A protein has these predicted regions:
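Acidic/polar loop patches that form or flank catalytic/metal-binding clefts of enzymes
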Residues: 31-33, 86-90, 114-124, 184-185
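Zn2+-dependent metallopeptidase catalytic core
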Residues: 13-32
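Long, charged, glycine-rich C-terminal linkers/tails
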Residues: 31-51
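Post-HExxH zinc-binding segment in Zn-dependent metallohydrolases
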Residues: 94-135
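C-terminal, non-catalytic "cap/extension" segments appended to globular domains
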Residues: 167, 171-306
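Short pre-active-site segment immediately N-terminal to the catalytic Zn-binding motif
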Residues: 55-69
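Single conserved hydrophobic/aromatic residue that forms the stacking wall/gate
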Residues: 1-7, 11
Length: 306
């Protein structure tokens, strides 16, 4: 499986911006309530359920980079936009926890966005935006390229299989920092050591190493495990959703409406009204990582013929 298909030639910047607009339309994001901006590190900023802004970064050599950051941040936006009106301007108006919040972003980015039915559904449009780069690439080739498993330097560009290794590096460093066994000045060296140990990756500089995320500089220590927790929550929600909704039939049409409606009913509307564990239980039963493990096993044994 090669990723050369995704990033072999220059992707015109304006087309990426137009494609991002298209993806937001597919997700059902009302542009009168959800803006899109550009930044170095994608993030979502919410004011209330009528005003949410998402951002992305355009890599002129890789259309998939912005594609999946828009789907990810769009998932955050849908959560905030789906919170009930009567909770607005109270302490219950935001998402209940970052673990649940990341379950929504990674649900749209990976469980739906990297699924074969969804990729096949939107791929004609992808080729329409990028005919020179992807005109001769089949939907199956593109699907395999955006799901290729390989160690990577940047967390936000990691595949689903190796993503949690990036989280583990940060978690180990945070534990040492908070426990007083590691000083901040030594973080770059420990980061490089762990990336080599966990992923076999050489870290070339601090910008692409311990400074690649905005979390620590913003004081968000202890945040990174929420990505792993959210991935597991999302897989469990998907398993339960499949009992109520024709998920893959909808995805194959590029219609995410019934998927978002289910999440809005089971998760979004409650904001912070319930405890995180109760939100998860209400949506899909007691938490277990088993659905996530099974999901990854099925997906990657199929992709690699194992």
């Amino acid at each position: 499986i090669t990723t050369r298909l995704v990033g072999s030639e220059m992707c015109i910047r304006d087309r990426q911006k137009a494609f991002a607009d298209y993806l937001m339309e597919v997700m059902g994001l009302d542009r009168s309530h959800c803006g899109l901006g550009e930044t170095e590190h994608p993030f979502t900023l919410e004011f209330n359920n009528k005003d949410v802004r998402i951002t992305t970064n355009y890599d002129e050599h890789n259309v998939a980079s912005s594609m999946y950051s828009v789907l990810h941040e769009g998932g955050h936006a849908l959560y905030e936009l789906g919170i009930r009106d009567d909770l607005q301007y109270t302490c219950l108006a935001g998402g209940v926890s970052m673990g649940v919040h990341e379950s929504q972003s990674r649900f749209y980015e990976n469980l739906i966005g990297r699924s074969r039915p969804f990729v096949e559904a939107i791929y004609p449009k992808v080729q329409e935006f990028f005919p020179q780069q992807l005109g001769g690439v089949s939907a199956e080739q593109f699907y395999r390229a955006v799901n290729k498993a390989q160690p990577s330097l940047i967390r936000t560009e990691a595949d689903e299989l190796t993503y949690c290794l990036h989280v583990m590096v940060r978690y180990e460093i945070e534990k040492q920092l908070i426990g007083g066994t590691l000083e901040a000045k030594d973080v770059p060296a420990v980061w490089a050591k762990l990336y080599k140990e966990y992923l076999g990756i050489e870290v070339p500089n601090d910008r692409d190493g311990c400074l690649q995320d905005s979390h620590w500089s913003g004081g968000a220590f202890g945040y990174f495990p929420s990505y792993a927790l959210g991935s597991a929550y999302g897989a469990q929600m998907l398993r339960r959703m499949e009992q109520d909704v024709d998920v893959w039939g909808a995805a194959a049409k590029g219609d995410l409406t019934p998927i978002t409606a289910w999440l809005r009913e089971k998760v979004h509307q409650y904001g912070g009204l319930m405890e995180p564990a109760d939100v998860v239980k209400n949506a899909c039963g007691d938490f277990s990582a088993e659905d996530y493990i099974q999901y990854l096993t099925r997906k990657y044994t199929g992709l690699y013929g194992l």
